Amino acid sequence: GPAIGFLQEMLRWWDYWLKDIDTGIMKEPMLRAYMQQDVPGSSWYADCPGRWVGEMQWPSSRISAKKFYLGDVGLSLTPTRDVVRVAVTPQTLGLAGGEWCPYGTGGEGPEFPGDQRFDDGASICFDGSPLRSDLEILGATKVTLDLSVDRPTAFVCVRLNDGKPDGSSTRVAYAVMNLTHRIGHHKVQNLIPGRRYRVKFQLSDAAYSFIRGHRLRVAISTTYWPMIWPSPEPVELTLHTKNSSIELPVRPSRGGPKIKPFLAAEEGPPMPTTVLSNEPSKNVVSHDVLSGRVEVFTQRGADGLVIEEHGLEVGGRATTERMSITEG
């Protein structure tokens, strides 16, 4: 989202709690979130379109659950006949996933999830009908899957995407579940191959507006490399759709508290410095078609400088990562 006067907001907060100054901060919404809208799938952003929204309480009574069932023709509001879908996804699925924790959160490099259509093409996908009106979500989407696998250890990755009329796809929320942790991280338990399990978990929190004419898309895979390590053996996942669903935290697009505009971002005057290096960050994917080997090369650019007043050298050195995997 856009830059805001974060320092001024912190000053208002601490003046209230430490100095007993009534800054009005406690009369404002408990939660303020940047509601993104029609964001293109890109590994780098200068800015994202959207607007600020607020809720006076959180959890908010204005958020309602809207359930979509996975079915034979995509997503539907009512259960359909049970259909079996089988996934054996490529080991390289996930190349458009971006970084789990972006290093340059200020948009310094290609670290965010890009266009999802290639990962979608190798996943089990369930698309909704084109939306007749805008649909906003705020919070965590809940997932229920009725599934079985053919190995004692397996992952399942679920992505909620914004499917656009031009064919592109933007990741809105996602989660990876290690199915041996289905009971909880406190009790790791291998799966029995062939046994059906009902698994429930939440996707990452999101504030996003799906606009009219776009489609909700649920994409399911057993791999998400290089964000997660591959399973010891390739996994075949069988999904039973009748008892599988997602539950969206839908927020009404109208109403709600008015948001006081943020002040412009401020910072102290910069000290005179001399730049030593300013190398760009990059992410390069190469594919050896003959061997099937895929390599990801990531470089975090160096950003060294010297503070002229006292000669202190600060900054980071360039770091590199190489990860590779071969299908099969």
Question: What residue spans do the PLM features occupy?
Answer:
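C-terminal, loop-rich substrate-recognition/catalytic regions characterized by aromatic stacking residues
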Residues: 2-328
